[in-house]
């Protein structure tokens, strides 16, 4: 019982402006819209939780990952704990994200399929190496590509067509505050018609 809709777009980022004042005016208007959406969603009794992001469907393995000499393709998601709760993603072992986690880090959670595929027995000793960087951030050495520490394992869930089986999945941390992504909201029990 999750709905999704697009409220905002990249308009202010992709548009050309005549001057800085015009750009600032548009930016301020966009920030105001974000605040209004937040206030309305937080106050609405129709929803249990809400956030921004893409639904975890149609995830295809596209990132080359290596561990102990084995290479496989994995699907990648960038999410926070609110997103995991909204979609009912269940932790099997290890931990989910905490206050110390940030976007620019080399930690990931994986699903059971990835664990089996890479034959990981002890996640405390597991690391996965991506073929290329998955993120860029100011102040990081972009010539390096360290391996990712596995901090948790989640239960498998379908990310695509039922006949395709479970895709190996890596979950990286994201604050989930990008209002240009679709807004998703989990409906409160018995509120489907009202929503």
Can you describe what each PLM-predicted range is?
Residues 3-5, 108, 128, 170-171, ...:
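Well-ordered beta-strand positions enriched in small/hydrophobic/aromatic, beta-favoring residues
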Residues 1-109, 113-116:
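Structured, solvent-exposed hinge/loop segments at the ends of secondary-structure elements
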Residues 27-49, 112-119, 132-195:
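"Rare, low-scoring activations can occur
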Residues 93, 122-126:
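PAS and related sensory helical modules
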Residues 106, 126, 148:
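Nucleotide donor/acceptor-binding cores
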Residues 62-70, 126-128, 164-169:
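Short, surface-exposed loop/helix-turn segments at secondary-structure junctions
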């Amino acid at each position: 019982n999750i709905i999704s809709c697009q409220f905002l777009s990249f308009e202010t980022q992709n548009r050309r402006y005549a001057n800085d004042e015009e750009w600032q005016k548009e930016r301020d208007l966009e920030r105001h819209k974000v605040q209004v959406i937040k206030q309305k969603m937080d106050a609405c009794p129709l929803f249990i939780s809400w956030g921004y992001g893409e639904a975890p469907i149609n995830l295809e393995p596209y990132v080359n990952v290596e561990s102990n000499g084995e290479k496989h393709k994995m699907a990648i998601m960038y999410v926070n704990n609110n997103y995991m709760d909204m979609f009912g993603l269940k932790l099997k072992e290890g931990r989910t994200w905490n206050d110390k986690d940030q976007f620019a880090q080399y930690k990931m959670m994986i699903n059971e399929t990835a664990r089996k595929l890479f034959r990981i027995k002890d996640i405390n000793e597991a690391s996965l190496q991506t073929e290329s960087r998955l993120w860029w951030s100011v102040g990081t050495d972009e010539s390096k590509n360290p391996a990712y520490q596995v901090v948790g394992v989640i239960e498998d869930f379908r990310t695509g067509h039922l006949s395709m089986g479970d895709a190996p999945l890596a979950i990286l941390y994201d604050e989930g505050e990008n209002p240009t992504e679709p807004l998703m909201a989990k409906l409160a029990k018995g509120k489907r018609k009202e929503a």
